[in-house]
């Protein structure tokens, strides 16, 4: 039945428009693209581009005003919202951590010790954790160690990895780590994700260059869509932002 159709299939946004409230302005306007199953798909967009709304729609937190979102040809509106959310792992830019041990934060969904450790290694946070006074039993938050933004993001990535969902979304969730760590995490994820469909939302182009395809979203519309190579070869916002970020990167590296 459509109710709990498998979600390890192509995800398609078909002519999706969306606005909040009855007569709010369109946040997304006639957006169409396909995320092939098991591939990595980048979404580049600044503030107000509509990228966060795409995520809210994919997680069934809102419904499109027009158009539909399908997984393997099945409209997600016909699936239980709970089921959709259980199958889409999301790592937010500012993740929520519980005032519990690091171990409990990562294994909140019932992962074994070995799975927790493996996830932390993939998320490049195992080294940090083992340096804490109590290692994985170190408390997080007010009564324990206060984690940096980058450490929080990596703990949240490890937590999401233990869920083993068929779809994974990173919502600017590598923004607080430096470019080198970002690269390390991404290559570890490529190695360990084993067939998950991965959507990476970012404003940092280097984070997206390894994706199979990239969507450039501008003011709620599809501005460009293609492989990184194709987008770098054509004049447009992607190339412009790439050149800008690369020149800033060179100054930082000097």
Where are these regions (language model features)?
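ABC-type nucleotide-binding domain
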Residues: 4-254
């Amino acid at each position: 039945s459509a109710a709990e159709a498998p979600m390890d299939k192509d995800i398609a946004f078909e002519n999706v428009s969306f606005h909040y409230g009855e007569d709010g302005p369109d946040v997304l306007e006639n957006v169409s693209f396909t995320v092939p199953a098991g591939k990595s798909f980048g979404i580049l967009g600044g503030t107000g581009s509509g990228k966060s709304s795409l995520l809210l729609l994919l997680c069934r937190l809102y419904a499109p005003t027009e158009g539909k979102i399908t997984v393997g040809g099945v409209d997600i509106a016909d699936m239980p919202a709970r089921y959709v959310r259980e199958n889409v792992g999301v790592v937010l830019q500012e993740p929520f951590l519980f005032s519990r041990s690091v171990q409990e934060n990562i294994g909140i969904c019932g992962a074994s010790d070995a799975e927790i450790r493996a996830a932390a290694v993939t998320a490049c946070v195992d080294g940090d954790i083992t340096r804490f006074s109590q290692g994985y039993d170190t408390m997080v938050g007010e009564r324990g160690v206060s984690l940096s933004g980058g450490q929080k993001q990596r703990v949240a990535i490890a937590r999401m990895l233990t869920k083993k969902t068929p779809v994974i979304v990173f919502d600017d969730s590598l923004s607080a780590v430096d470019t080198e760590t970002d690269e390390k995490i991404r290559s570890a994820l490529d190695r360990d994700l084993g067939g998950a469909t991965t959507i990476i939302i970012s404003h940092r182009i280097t984070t997206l260059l390894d994706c199979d395809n990239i969507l450039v979203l501008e003011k709620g519309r599809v501005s460009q869509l293609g492989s990184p190579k194709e987008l770098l070869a054509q004049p447009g916002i992607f190339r412009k932002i790439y050149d800008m970020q690369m020149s800033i990167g060179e100054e930082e590296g000097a």
